[in-house]
């Protein structure tokens, strides 16, 4: 469900007064004239935007806060996603199966006080995803207006190191410690004489069926 924070439209955030910047250089230097994408630049910029969104959030009009809260209530996935991103950042982006045990198994009792302690960071991730969703919907509306069709691509399986797998282990062929029971791939074919091993957990369809594929 989540979108990549690198797609945030900074101009839109400024125009709509979600962030206040008197000088674009406040966001820091970015490397120009490069023939490749600079991931470090993108990460640093996203972090700065997140902090700006948080700083300006308390001064936003009540209507916007209500819209945000309504979006949160309709997108339950955001709770686990935001928590996952913040925990991952705390442990130097290690995969979740290398986190300390209580984080790895998602011990709710243990995490309760930790979530309160990191509430600002968690709010930042929620705000980023809310803005991304709003901006995406605006693009989709614009495309519809001019009869432009958008095509998306979905993977067969879910990444092992993802919020979805970490928070819903029982739905995948994976143990609580992160070890794979079964993993996806394809046998040898025209494209690969040795076949392919993708490293993503397969689905426990019986578990999905019991939840009505919710």
What are these regions (language model features)?
Residues 125-158:
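Conserved, well-ordered alpha-helix/loop/beta-strand core segments that scaffold catalytic motifs
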């Amino acid at each position: 469900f989540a979108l990549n924070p690198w797609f945030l439209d900074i101009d839109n955030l400024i125009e709509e007064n979600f962030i206040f910047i008197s000088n674009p250089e406040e966001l820091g230097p970015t490397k120009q004239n490069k023939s490749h994408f600079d991931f470090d630049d993108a990460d640093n910029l996203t972090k700065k935007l997140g902090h700006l969104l948080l700083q300006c959030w308390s001064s936003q009009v009540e209507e916007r806060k209500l819209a945000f809260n309504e979006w949160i209530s309709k997108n339950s996935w955001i709770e686990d996603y935001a928590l996952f991103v913040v925990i991952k950042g705390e442990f130097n982006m290690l995969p979740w199966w290398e986190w300390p045990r209580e984080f790895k198994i998602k011990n709710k009792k243990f995490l309760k006080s930790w979530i309160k302690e990191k509430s600002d960071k968690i709010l930042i991730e929620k705000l980023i995803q809310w803005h991304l969703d709003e901006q995406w919907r605006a693009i989709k509306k614009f495309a519809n207006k001019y009869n432009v069709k958008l095509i998306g691509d979905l993977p067969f399986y879910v990444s092992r190191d993802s919020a979805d797998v970490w928070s819903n282990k029982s739905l995948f062929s994976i143990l609580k410690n992160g070890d794979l029971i079964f993993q996806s791939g394809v046998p040898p074919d025209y494209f690969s004489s040795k076949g392919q091993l993708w490293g993503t957990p397969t689905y426990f369809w019986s578990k999905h069926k019991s939840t009505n594929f919710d």
